[in-house]
Amino acid sequence: MKLGVNIDHIATIRNARQINEPDPLMALQILKEAGADQVTIHLREDRRHITDFDAGRICQNSFLPVNMECSINPEIIDIICSLKPHRATLVPEKREEVTTEGGLDIIKFEKEIKNAIEKLHNNDIEVSLFIDPDFEQITKSAEVGAEMIELHTGKYANLHLALNTNINSTPFKVFENMDRKTLKKELELELKLLKDATILGNELGLEVAAGHGLNYQNVKPVADIEGIVELNIGHSIIANSVFLGLKQAIIQMRELING
């Protein structure tokens, strides 16, 4: 099981003060030493965390393969092609969202996605599509020529939070109208859906990754799904690094995934 560590929120901390530290570039050696397999960054259209300057230096200096998340905006795709990361993961974007909400609609944006994939492939860049665990979306992902899909685990993660933490006693409530019995049932159904989606993806010749909202409490059941080859995790690791340091935070996540 590969672990991609998303370092966007190192840039978020830097940008909170609008200065030049912490520098995301400094994380690269730590990721390598801690056993990460990949560095993941998201070059958003609004540049709210990682900037073009960051992306260029990371792609040029990373010891590890770089997975760049991006929208299907042609201008962004051109930037990705110029930077030549190992992989581009196409994701949906809304400027008003706090974080990526839901997967990319491959059916609705098939033409635009095909154009993006063709351009990326012409620049020797692998393509992954960040999608909900929906059978129609998975089937279409194979048809448009992607090598990989990344299953959106956000619903699973939020159900786990609602069932197992105090999140609904905070301002950041999720699934607050569900009782515990319903939450448990929905969590089981979502995990089964992720398993079934993985099976379908593999049958269609796609590599399957997963990510979004995964943390130290909920990662193990997803890591245990046969057929998932990679997890991309960011916020939880960066948040834990405030208390443990980045290297130890990655090591702990790696141990959970491998255990």
Curated annotation (Swiss-Prot):
The pathway to which it is assigned is: Cofactor biosynthesis; pyridoxine 5'-phosphate biosynthesis; pyridoxine 5'-phosphate from D-erythrose 4-phosphate: step 5/5
Is Metal-binding one of the keywords? Answer: no
Catalytic activity reads:
3-amino-2-oxopropyl phosphate + 1-deoxy-D-xylulose 5-phosphate = pyridoxine 5'-phosphate + phosphate + 2 H2O + H(+)
Annotated Gene Ontology cellular components are: cytosol
Q: Which InterPro entries match?
A: Aldolase_TIM, PyrdxlP_synth_PdxJ, Pyridoxine-5'_phos_synth
* Superkingdom of origin organism: Bacteria
Please list the residues that bind 1-deoxy-D-xylulose 5-phosphate.
D8, H9, R44, H49, T99
Active-site residues (renumbered): H42, E69, H212
GO MF terms on file? pyridoxine 5'-phosphate synthase activity
Q: Indicate the secretion signal residues.
A: none
Membrane-crossing ranges are none
Q: Where in the cell is it found?
A: Cytoplasm
* List of residues binding 3-amino-2-oxopropyl phosphate: N6, R17, G213, G234, H235
Pfam families in the cross-refs: PdxJ
Site annotation (Transition state stabilizer) points to E150
Q: What is its EC number?
A: 2.6.99.2
Its Gene Ontology biological processes? pyridoxine biosynthetic process
Give the keywords, sorted.
Answer: Cytoplasm, Pyridoxine biosynthesis, Transferase
Under the heading CDD domains, the entry gives: PNPsynthase (cd00003)
Described function? Catalyzes the complicated ring closure reaction between the two acyclic compounds 1-deoxy-D-xylulose-5-phosphate (DXP) and 3-amino-2-oxopropyl phosphate (1-amino-acetone-3-phosphate or AAP) to form pyridoxine 5'-phosphate (PNP) and inorganic phosphate.
- Family membership: Belongs to the PNP synthase family.
NCBIfam families per UniProt = pdxJ (TIGR00559), PRK05265.1-3 (NF003625), PRK05265.1-5 (NF003627)
Q: Which PANTHER family match?
A: PYRIDOXINE 5'-PHOSPHATE SYNTHASE
How does the record describe its quaternary structure? Answer: Homooctamer; tetramer of dimers.
Q: What protein am I looking at?
A: Pyridoxine 5'-phosphate synthase
